[in-house]
Amino acid sequence: MVIPGMKIICAYPVNLDALYDLGEERISRFIQSADPSGIKSEMKGSIRSREDLISSLLYCIQHGSGAEILVESLQLAEEIEASFPWSFRLGGNAGIMANLLAELGARPILNAPALEPRLAALLHPGVGIPVSGRLMQPSLAAERPDLSSEVLHFVFQFKESDRIPSPQGPISAAKDNRFIATYDPVNTRMVSNQDFDAYCQDHIQEIDGAILSGFHLAPRDRYREIFPPRIEQIRSWKEANPNIYIHVEMGSFQSQKIARHFLRLLEKADSLGLNEDELETATAEYSAIGSSPVSSTVLSTVLSTARPKMSQWQERVQKAAGLREHLGIFRVSVHTRDYILSIMEEGKITAKEELLSLQKGADAAAALAATGSAKGMPPNEVNPRGLEAKREFCRQGAEAAGVGRGAFHKRDGLVVSLMPSLLAREPRITVGLGDTATAATFYKELQAIKRDRI
């Protein structure tokens, strides 16, 4: 049974992404224009200079990790923009997810306080922008002068084995990934306009879900004033409509201190999503305050091993389970390059429905990487590391049930699910894969929840 036109709030960040595929000659000139004594392969808390940008970029390349870091000044942002030949595409977690949800048949309600014509042209016409109590197509909403302001994020994409020069010698990329340098006074403040706030509050009873992100963009010196209004907004939605299904994406925070503050405010959310790097930050948070991972029967079975130490996927299951218990929420999911896993309570969704939802997300992300479109044909090859993790998962006991490409384990009120990714050998896109997987998974989950209520 198809649930037509589900209304889903998408907030908060939407912007233009300026993309650059790293090329040795151009990046060499940029590095040569900086002070070599200020360049070291290390992650900076923010970007105050060319040297900070290069140091953080080299760190991500060397470790194959992704990150998003704030650029501190408009002047530096203009220097970065002038230094590379950029291509432009839709960016911002909320914008990417709203577009995909509209393609899937939902009716997304997008917060877009900085909507100018070039950005509006990249949004699906099925995305609704609240204006004066009604939803308008993006192209029409962009004609309003109070919504017009251009926002750019600089995305440096790199591929495995790319070689980049540095003052300490060439550095080779460990994995495909991206580094994002952001100067964005709108999304970093998590701004929402009055029309969006009023529409959501007035129509909350008819809204089925909300998928929220952008908390990681808050500056170090302002997060304590930025978070409370947004968390209060989530609380008001949940109290007015207890059936609304709310998923929050964590993002790459500038510091563990900000991450700790954010996680303590999440009791009204149903679900939290993270990538593998963000999981490390989040679990450092609960470890730091003395919470320990759960030791339920289902987890002790899943994590049993004859090896001297647990496999990486088992460690991530343990950390995700501990985080879910610490937060007291329904579900935690972790999307990695090799697989997507989730830990959830039984009740809202069956184990099979969750696994099919994860497969929907993994397939959409793989299709986007391989073809440039989430609705394209996904590749056939299963990620070998993800497949091996699934096989180990199924070897943990008879309770692990293989369903299609993935598997789940259900016991004592908890469900652990693992879905291997598909492998795009020559990816066309590396940005927005996590958002795509998250939105497609969320849509499938919400369909299952709605079916159960009918």
Question: Which role does the model predict for each range below?
Answer:
Residues M1-V431, D435-T436, F442-I454:
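Ribokinase/PfkB-type carbohydrate-kinase core domain
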